[in-house]
């Protein structure tokens, strides 16, 4: 009788474990079943005059420094870019009214967001959805002045 009770207890434990795993899997997907996991979560760095072109985009015409910045890209294409204190140090402020972000996948697939307000103190937040290719290898995010997709003033990295 003990063997049956022990077997039943093990079976019940296995069912509970599988149920918990299934609940976790469904919780990490959106309503369409697309995983919501991060494919990029990285700090942002201001561009310097010595920085190279990245993915066909050139660095801004002045050096930029940033107090704090992060970019987060989820597998479903949701993008959040937080920028604090992105300024031109020789000016002590940001002269631009708006900025946008460019997501790069596979070293060449670029997707640019709509422009958002960019304060004189260098603060901005981009919250957008971008259509990602089926595979997004080596993702990167670049911050663009105004809606100029050919230039970057900050990029993910260190």
What are these regions (language model features)?
Residues 109-158:
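Helix-rich interaction surfaces within compact, conserved domain-sized segments
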Residues 29-31, 65, 100-106, 128:
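Mature extracytoplasmic/periplasmic regions of secreted or cell-envelope proteins
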Residues 66-68, 78-80, 123-127:
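Intrinsic-disorder/low-complexity, polar/charged segments enriched in Ser/Thr/Lys/Arg/Asp/Glu/Gln
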Residues 70-109:
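Mature extracytoplasmic domains of secretory-pathway proteins
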Residues 29-75:
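Transition segment at domain starts
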């Amino acid at each position: 009788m003990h063997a049956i009770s022990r077997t039943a207890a093990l079976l019940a434990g296995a069912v509970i474990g599988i149920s918990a795993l299934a609940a976790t899997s469904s919780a990490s997907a959106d309503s369409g079943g697309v995983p919501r996991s991060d494919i990029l979560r990285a700090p942002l760095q201001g561009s310097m005059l010595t920085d190279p072109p990245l993915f066909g985009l050139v660095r801004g015409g002045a050096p930029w420094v940033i107090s704090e910045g992060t970019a987060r890209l989820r597998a479903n294409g949701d993008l959040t870019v937080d920028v604090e204190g992105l300024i031109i140090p020789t000016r002590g402020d940001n002269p631009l009214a708006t900025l946008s972000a460019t997501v790069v996948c596979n070293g060449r697939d670029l997707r640019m967001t709509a422009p958002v307000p960019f304060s004189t103190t260098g603060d901005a937040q981009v919250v957008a959805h971008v259509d990602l290719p089926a595979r997004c290898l080596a993702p990167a995010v670049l911050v663009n002045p105004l809606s100029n997709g050919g230039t970057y003033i900050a990029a993910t990295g260190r």
